[in-house]
Amino acid sequence: NDIKLSLAVGFNGARLHEKIFEERFLYHADRLGYIVWGEFPNWSLDSSYADSVYGILPEWTEEIRRDFNHPAIVGWCPYNETWDTDGRKQFDDALDIVYRATKALDPTRPCIDTSGNYHVATDIFCVHDYEQNPEIFKEHYDKLMTEGTLFDNHAHRQTYKGEATFVSE
């Protein structure tokens, strides 16, 4: 019913945020032409340690293998907002390893290494921008259209390299 309600109000898809959705949902998304992103519930996963890969990779690869044949899935996103934890910076190699594993399992779809920040290796530069003033929001992205540069609150930690851009939050 959620998909039908979403379609009825004009949406054609959704970011399945921080959750591995049931196959039944994906079946109906396929059937109804509703596009979705496959994500992983990474809250409380401390990405500042090298061994954080062990906390995500087994289930993440299982999800990709299970859901690979669903045409409704248009991309993958294993992490969300990999903020530094307790003053420790994220372990960039962990994100890189998970990104590369994702691309090895499914080279046909784009992968966002982490939704929001801090990007290491990504096909789509995903931004979280909560600006509520439409004029200021427009200013943030005008240069992307005219000069190919991107407003980024986190430019000191990540580099925009001309990737497609997605304001997901």
Explain the meaning of each model-derived region.
Residues 1:
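Glycine-rich phosphate-binding "P-loop"
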Residues 5, 13-169:
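Substrate-binding/catalytic cleft of secreted carbohydrate-active enzymes
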Residues 9:
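Metal- or metallocofactor-binding catalytic centers and their adjacent structured scaffolds
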